[in-house]
Each structure stands twice: as structure tokens, then as C-alpha cells.
Amino acid sequence: MRKFMIALLGASFLAGAAEAYDGEQFVVCKLNPLGDNFLALRSCGSTSCDVIRKLGPDTFVITMEPYATNGWREVIVQQSSQDWSYAGVKGWVYGKYICHVDLSE
């Protein structure tokens, strides 16, 4: 019976972990307009990685994972706030410079 309970607990844990993350919408924000005024989209989550594209203020992105990794978020660039095609350029941005978009309004 104990082995059955452990197996059941393990199966329920795996089922919960298998849920898909659909992504959340964020917008580039908190940039210094007197500085470079762009957010670097990079090939990986580090400043040593190549810059793929420079994202300006108010650029919309969709996150690929629910949480940041060492402050970095993997994202897909959207063409507009209505673009949910997931077909945009993919890369990494520093999470401090993206703000969550509340879609409940």
C-alpha cells in the first residue's frame, strides 16, 4: 500500500508539472530617455551574449517562462499588443525593463 501511495503522489506531481505556460504579455518600460533608450534583446540571458535587436519603449513581448532566470526573461517580440502569433523574434531581455500588461480591463 505504501508503494502505491508513493507512486500516486509522484504521478500527481508530474501531472501538475506538465501544465503548459501560454506566456504573458509585457511591454518595454523604465528606460532612461537620456541614455540609450532601448532594451537589448539578446541571444541568451547574459550581457556577454550577442544583441539580436534593440527594443524601443512600448515594445510588446510575450514571456516564454513564468519566472525570470537570474533576472533574465526569455521572450518573443510582438508586432503589436494584439499579435499573439508567437511568430516574432525570440531572445532574452533583462526583466527589470519590462512591465506586465494587465489584460483584464
What are these regions, as identified by a protein language model?
Residues 21-36:
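Short N-terminal segments immediately surrounding and downstream of signal-peptide cleavage
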Residues 7-15:
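Bacterial N-terminal signal peptides
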Residues 16-20:
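Sec/Tat signal peptide C-region and signal peptidase I cleavage site
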Residues 25-26, 45-46, 66-69:
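Short glycine/proline-centered loop/turn elements that form peptide/ligand docking sites
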Residues 36-46:
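Short, structured beta-strand/loop micro-motifs enriched in basic residues and often containing a Trp
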Residues 52-96:
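SH3/SH3-like beta-barrel superfamily modules
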Residues 93-105:
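Short, low-complexity, Pro/Ser/Thr/Gly-rich segments in the mature regions of secreted, periplasmic
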Residues 1-4:
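Positively charged n-region of N-terminal signal peptides that target proteins for export
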